[in-house]
């Protein structure tokens, strides 16, 4: 069982060198991958920004979005995590805290590319940076 955050998923979807490392880390866990619903919005926003900045084409953005929809992820609503997200407010943004809170609740490692999130204190999640 693994929790994925948006930074790891965007790299995986765009098949970057970092995305290859993400895939190597999670391949044995498929389809036991978990994330808060927030991931979909965060990934869509990054794809939108990359298209606007001409980092990827609109077509590639659409393909990545479809790949996201097709991923075998178990998604969790935020309401179950809100109090823990709030309690992490001094160490993490609410966005990052959603992933950390889910990892804590499931007792699963969190895979991320975000070193700042991984360095935060005040939680019991096992965070693995790719």
Can you name each region flagged by the protein language model?
Residues 4, 35, 94-97, 112:
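Short beta-strand scaffold positions
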Residues 1, 88, 100-130:
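Acidic, PIN/NYN-like endoribonuclease modules and their adjacent C-terminal/linker elements
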Residues 20, 57-58, 74-78, 95-96:
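Short, structured loop/turn "capping" segments at alpha-beta junctions
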Residues 39-40, 60-90:
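Acidic catalytic patch
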Residues 8-9, 39, 81, 99, ...:
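Alpha-helix capping/helix-boundary segments
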Residues 1-38, 50-59, 63:
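Short, well-structured N-terminal submotif of metal-dependent ribonuclease cores
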């Amino acid at each position: 069982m693994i929790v994925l955050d948006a930074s790891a998923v965007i790299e995986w979807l765009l098949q970057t060198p970092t995305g290859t490392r993400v895939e190597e880390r999670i391949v044995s866990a498929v389809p036991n991958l978990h994330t808060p619903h927030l991931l979909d919005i965060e990934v869509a926003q990054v794809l939108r920004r990359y298209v606007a900045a001409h980092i990827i084409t609109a077509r590639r953005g659409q393909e990545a979005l479809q790949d996201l929809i097709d991923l075998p992820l178990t998604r969790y609503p935020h309401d179950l995590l809100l109090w823990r997200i709030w309690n992490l407010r001094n160490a993490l943004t609410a966005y990052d805290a959603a992933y950390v809170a889910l990892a804590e609740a499931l007792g699963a490692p969190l895979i991320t590319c975000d070193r700042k999130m991984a360095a935060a204190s005040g939680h019991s999640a096992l965070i693995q940076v790719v």
